[in-house]
Swiss-Prot record:
The lineage of its organism: Archaea, Methanobacteriati, Methanobacteriota, Stenosarchaea group, Halobacteria. This is GTP cyclohydrolase MptA. Pfam families: GCHY-1. It comes from the Archaea. Converts GTP to 7,8-dihydro-D-neopterin 2',3'-cyclic phosphate, the first intermediate in the biosynthesis of coenzyme methanopterin. Pathway: Cofactor biosynthesis; 5,6,7,8-tetrahydromethanopterin biosynthesis. Its EC number is 3.5.4.39. Its cofactor is Fe(2+). The keyword Hydrolase applies. Belongs to the GTP cyclohydrolase IV family.
Length: 309
């Protein structure tokens, strides 16, 4: 066999069509996040890494490319990083430098993030999880955009279902000769039942360079956009708290997305106008065989104008 094996990937393809993304998915790496005066946070992260491919090239040197990708990821995660989006940005920029045939590189990362907290009523220590979402795109002109965000779970209560329950309760109380003021006061203090859903909220922020946002703040915004937070540990007072809180703030799936937008505007009113915000809410319905979904992708400047109007 010849010592010089043919470079098939560098040959011309049978069909001259360029490809938007070619790469590897599911690359697992440990990532350490720096914390001042504390041990770093260690994440088991999964990376997807892509480059674009011109129409004149058959392949992207997948096996050789994987060595480069693995080497760059090892270098990027060898020391504690300030942010996961910076790790993605660093790898994307190195990919552009390493490949003379590509014009754009994209790196995506997901990891599970543990949150230490206390139960809402009994103040018992517990832990919650959130999925971190980070990505970066670098191009041949030296431009890099980075994205950071999260996916969290919570609960919601249907306002329509609750409204029907409240109407029924009002009719019953009127039939028992309870006066109108007392009925109004009771219904104001005691929210009526509505069917509940497990809610899934996703919130990401993308800017040119490193987004000037805090991951924990984004997690809080996403969790608080639903009717109530949920907890792994819950004694009876905690269950009562979550039930009461959720029914006191019943929300449609659309309301949750709008709450995310409003929460982001309140926390970060000065983000650049060209910041891209992605907000999604999916609710697992309890009384239907289908689920509910709403989303919005918008520039921050547009969101700011809509809320002000």
């Amino acid at each position: 066999m010849s010592q010089q094996l043919p470079d098939v990937q560098a040959s011309s393809p049978d069909v001259s069509v360029g490809l938007s993304r070619v790469g590897v998915t599911g690359v697992e790496k440990l990532v350490k996040l720096h914390r001042p005066n504390d041990r770093p946070i260690v994440l088991m992260a999964e990376f997807d890494v892509f480059v674009d491919l011109p129409s004149w090239r058959k392949g992207a040197d997948m096996s050789r490319n994987m060595e480069v990708v693995d080497e760059m990821l090892e270098e990027a995660v060898s020391e504690p990083a300030l942010s996961v989006e910076d790790v993605c940005g660093d790898v994307a920029e190195r990919l552009i430098e390493k490949h003379d045939y590509t014009t754009q590189a994209e790196v995506r990362m997901e990891a599970e993030y543990m949150i230490r907290e206390e139960t809402p009523a009994t103040d018992r220590p517990t832990q919650a999880t959130a999925d971190i979402i980070a990505s970066a795109t670098a191009d041949e002109d030296g431009n890099t955009r980075e994205e950071i965000g999260c996916h969290v779970v919570g609960m919601t209560v249907c306002p329509c279902s609750q409204g029907m329950s409240e109407s029924r309760a009002r009719d019953v109380l009127e039939g028992l000769d309870v006066d109108r003021d007392t009925i109004d006061a009771f219904l104001e203090e005691v929210p009526q039942p509505g069917h509940s859903q497990r809610g899934h909220a996703t919130l990401t922020v993308e800017t040119s360079g490193d987004p000037d946002v805090d991951l924990r703040t984004l997690i809080d915004i996403a969790r608080d956009s639903m009717s109530a937070r949920i907890y792994n540990l819950a004694k009876r007072p905690d269950e009562d708290h979550m039930t009461f809180e959720s029914h006191s703030d019943a929300k449609f799936v659309e309301d949750c997305v709008r709450s995310m937008a409003n929460g982001l505007l309140e926390e970060y009113p000065d983000l650049p106008d060209d910041t891209i915000v992605r907000m999604e809410q999916s609710n697992d319905e309890s009384i239907h065989q289908h689920n509910a979904h709403a989303e919005r992708v918008a520039e921050f400047g547009q969101l700011r104008r809509e809320v002000r109007d």
